[in-house]
Amino acid sequence: MLSETELRALKKLSTTTTRVVGDSTLALPSNVKLSKGEVEKIAVTKKEMFDELAQCNLPTIELITREHTFNGDAIRFAAWLFLMNGQKLMTANNVVVRMGMQYSTNLAGNNVEINYVTSNSVVKLGHIPAGVLAAPYSGKGSGLFITYEQNLITNTVETGKVCVLFITSLSTTASAVNSFAYSYCNVPVESWDFNMIKLTAETSCASLTAMTNLVNTLVPDDRVRPVGLYVDIPGVTVTTSASLGSLPITTIPATTPLIFSAYTKQVEEVGVVNTLYALSYLP
């Protein structure tokens, strides 16, 4: 694999031949001096390699396939599809309402039509009725839930707002201690930006600080790595609970306008939730 500079250098050392560039070029012996065309045929540049890895493009596919594969990005789609259906790691069924789609799978595993929300003539998000959760959330796991106008913690209607909720075990899966907490916020739909939301164990924020303090109340052998809800949207406050003796939520009402939901069975796998979110929404 060559850099662009190395490729140019090889071309300068090339010669003129009467050979026709084609598949036979790859079979030329090692002691033959190549023409510029033969150099281009044989060489693989770093840029070409990275372009292929980044896009893995499927240029001739139909529109309905492009929609499902992030515009032909087969590598991204394969990773996304694996996590969406990773029931060994996560409680079924994950919900991801992706922008630009017509239908999305609900908590029951059924495809339902997406309702889109517009603010100032801009489509901000889509949501679907949650449906009936296949099995209650349980165990010492961790989950991210995004709903439209329905706060799952306070059970209140938040008109014109996107409600983000992160729940997590503070103790390890192997620990005998039951300790949980949550962080949540309500974001005005006109300010909503998928790119400004993430779970973090390293970016300083109020939620991570609060979660760290809660984790540190446990004995060292029971502690998980603290993870918080990071929201980089002006004017939005993230609230974190005190420690709790049980999961903050175990189900989602069937009529809830749901945008995203994913819950790992074991808290140590929280990074899977972040990865699924990033694959689903980030550029």
Curated annotation (Swiss-Prot):
Compartment annotation: Virion
Pfam families registered for this protein in UniProt: Reoviridae_Vp9 (PF08978)
InterPro entries assigned to the protein according to its UniProt record, in alphabetical order: VP9/VP10/VP11, VP9_N
Gene Ontology biological process terms, A to Z: symbiont entry into host cell; virion attachment to host cell
Membrane spanning residue stretches: none
Organism from which the protein derives: Banna virus
Its job: Spike-forming protein that mediates virion attachment to the host cell receptors and plays a major role in cell penetration.
GO cellular component: viral capsid
NCBIfam families found in the cross-reference section: seadorna_VP9
Name of the protein described by the UniProt record: Spike protein VP9
Assigned keywords, A-Z: Capsid protein, Host-virus interaction, Viral attachment to host cell, Virion, Virus entry into host cell
Gene3D superfamilies: Reoviridae VP9, N-terminal domain (6.10.100.10)
Principal cellular location given in the protein's record: virion
Quaternary structure note: Trimers.
Lineage: Viruses, Riboviria, Orthornavirae, Duplornaviricota, Resentoviricetes
